[in-house]
Amino acid sequence: MSHSLRIIFAGTPDFAARHLEALLASDHQIVGVFTQPDRPSGRGNKLTPSPVKALALQHDLPVFQPASLRPEENQRLVASLQADVMVVVAYGLILPQAVLDMPRLGCVNVHGSLLPRWRGAAPIQRALWAGDSETGVTIMQMDAGLDTGDMLLKLSCLITQDDTSATLYDKLSALGPQGLLTTLAQLADGRAQAQQQDDALACYAEKLSKEEARLDWQLPAEQLARCVRAFNPWPVSFFMLEGQPVKVWGANVLHQESDAQPGTIVGADKQGIAVATAQGILLLTQLQPAGKKSMAARDLLNSRKESFLAGTLLD
């Protein structure tokens, strides 16, 4: 039977909230929750609490929202909570060395990749876009570097041909809490075994930009299909047609070659809109014209068939 730990939890988005839920259901004591300041959101730009803050308040947990942990008064606040360990999941703020050293068992992070592959901000999307066959979560002891700390536990899952960032996010949201609770039990009992990362195997998952989501027809169809899956649900792949962006939510690869210029529509029917690429044909199956909802290609063709005639060049 492992011992109960005094835990500070630091996290912000829904992915982090799912880990907080698991801790709330455990025997551990959460002595404080740190999350980013409320941000403007929605059409009215109303200040909105993070998913972690909303969950913490539901459970009457003390919530702290500093803009930085560098000021000494904020570091004194962390120290005053006398935590055994600080659990950090997608918090979004840098932890100074003084904070990393405060808890008796240090600071533990849940990262959405099999480290040292895909250190950085967008590991789920980059793994999909690169065509990786598996990914997972790594529980690590934090140090001052970017996802460079010693690894305490790794759990993996397969990436299927149908996975998007949304579905992979859900898979890792289930794996992460499981791995976290196992690691905390090992830390509490002194059974945790840390393994150093091999820096030679490291690669970095840079933050996504909307510009990257524009489909480049000079790439092979296989790579473009991965791009569509990686950028679903954000920022969503797109192309330009008649001066307007058309988002692509779903696409498949047709293993056929075409002599047409990449970006040229070579066919359109109820199955989808077929576009020539540098190698193979990309079949667009789910699209969203500007100002409209996402729809199946056949529904778009019913209303705008003249825009998707064979020979039309997409930008």
Curated annotation (Swiss-Prot):
It catalyses: L-methionyl-tRNA(fMet) + (6R)-10-formyltetrahydrofolate = N-formyl-L-methionyl-tRNA(fMet) + (6S)-5,6,7,8-tetrahydrofolate + H(+). One of its GO terms (molecular function) is methionyl-tRNA formyltransferase activity. It comes from the Bacteria. Gene3D superfamilies: Formyl transferase, C-terminal domain, Formyl transferase, N-terminal domain. Its EC number is 2.1.2.9. InterPro entries: Fmt (IPR005794), Formyl_trans_C (IPR005793), Formyl_trans_C_sf (IPR037022), Formyl_transf_N (IPR002376), Formyl_transf_N_sf (IPR036477), Formyl_transferase-like_C_sf (IPR011034), GART_AS (IPR001555), Met-tRNA-FMT_C (IPR044135). Keywords: Protein biosynthesis, Transferase. Pfam families: Formyl_trans_C, Formyl_trans_N. It is an enzyme of class 2 (transferase). (6S)-5,6,7,8-tetrahydrofolate binds at S113, L114, L115, P116. CDD domains: FMT_core_Met-tRNA-FMT_N (cd08646), Met_tRNA_FMT_C (cd08704). One of its GO terms (cellular component) is cytosol. Belongs to the Fmt family. Attaches a formyl group to the free amino group of methionyl-tRNA(fMet). The formyl group appears to play a dual role in the initiator identity of N-formylmethionyl-tRNA by promoting its recognition by IF2 and preventing the misappropriation of this tRNA by the elongation apparatus. This is Methionyl-tRNA formyltransferase.
